Amino acid sequence: MKQDITLAPMTAADLPLLAGWMAQPHWHEWWAADVETELGYLRDMLGGRDSTRPFLFSLDGRPVGYIQVWRVADARVEPWLTEAPWVMDLPDDAVGVDLSIGPAGSLSQDIGSRALAAFVSMLRAEGYRTIVIDPDPANARAIRAYEKAGFRPIPLLRGRTPGCLLMQHHDRPLADG
């Protein structure tokens, strides 16, 4: 039986939980900043100093991961332009998403793809049409999860940075070739 995935906006009360997750090796491998730096970013989001919207996702009421949405138009400033020049090639109303599973024991259980699909449904209901995600090409587990959720690599864009596989969500799954 599939368990229910729910999404909830993150609050300051969730910071200790996130700090614990961020200290785990599977998280730190793909989110390069140290825990205190990441918590600072989250405090900026929660305080309205950053337009990124942070959420937790839960499995049957138990928090198991973090997901966020950011506006591409807001990323067209330094240092993001240097790190991700492809943001200039996307529509102004495009959004990007990032996510991570919290507890290591929840990895490779289809939770990430299900949470991402639920998040995309929420974003579609809010009117977003262009939704992208940019995993590290070496993160095969994440790429598989994103593909299950309907994301596909998009053609090489002018100025795309190495170390980034840009993927876009498609409303209908593409036939595997």
Regions found by a protein language model. Give the residues of each.
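Short, P/G- and charge-enriched loop/turn segments at secondary-structure junctions
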Residues: 41-44, 81-88, 154-155
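Short loop/turn motifs at secondary-structure junctions and domain boundaries
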Residues: 45-49
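Conserved acetyl-CoA-binding loop-helix of GNAT-fold acetyltransferases
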Residues: 108-125, 144-148
